[in-house]
Amino acid sequence: MELKDYTYELPENKIAAHPPKIRGTSRLLALNRKNGEITDSFYKNIADFFENGDILILNDTKVIKARLFTTKENGAERELIILERHSFDSDWHKHKVMYRGKIKAGDKLFVKNYSPDKNNGIFESAEITVEEILGDGLAIVSSKTDLRELCENFGTVPLPPYMRRDATPLDIERYQTVFAEEKGSVAAPTASLNMTDEILESLKKKGVKIGYLTLHVGLGTFMPIRVEKIEEHQMHKEYFEIPAETAEEIRKVHQNGGRVFALGTTVARTLEYAHNAIFEKSLNGNSGNREDLSKVSKNQNGDL
């Protein structure tokens, strides 16, 4: 497959840079795969397309304030997006980052808005050391302070590049799903941003089961495809977990003839990747078995 085969025209004025005033009021286009019928509706009416006995799987990941603005010792500003731990076996003091501006191994970066007087006693340091340059705008950095804490206190939400605007205080709430629980994503599972508690309740009243899994959206969401042959594009790894109870509910619904719905591509690729483990029942979070993907999926490839 060639990249040019996927080229299409998308006017910038058709890209929503801001959320609707009221969550859940976006439009919804539905395709009936059996008869090809297309329905123009609204997201709030999504329950109309479900039946009693179906299950909807949601991604409960939570977007972190992963964008940090820093300065070098000479005062030059450098922007970092904290992506993931250097390795899934390491602590949270060493991370892979995407950076903007020139940096080199050994550089010291200082988090903007950090004041030793104001923040004394909260953080040991707000200094970040560049350990290694990886190429493609990526680097390994380290800090004496847990980088997640630095992000939480001094970071901003890393909005997707296509929005072409800076984050605002409103994005802390609206660029987050209403059911977000597990911190770790650098981007929201977009299809879920329109979901509301009221819509979820309407699904439950119709007899639809709700299940959860976690996939932390990572570097791949920001990295462009730079090769002409799509098969040569290297996907980046993403951390995911599927609880045993979710796997069991999926099996039950499937056995009873119900349908399994994945809300968004993050859920779809996780279920596709773990399909065999779910239906072979090797996914059992209560067993502590090393075949339990909810425990050993910390380094699974995101190429699903």
What are these model-derived regions, one by one?
Residues 1-285, 289-304:
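Surface-exposed, charge/polar-rich loops and edge strands
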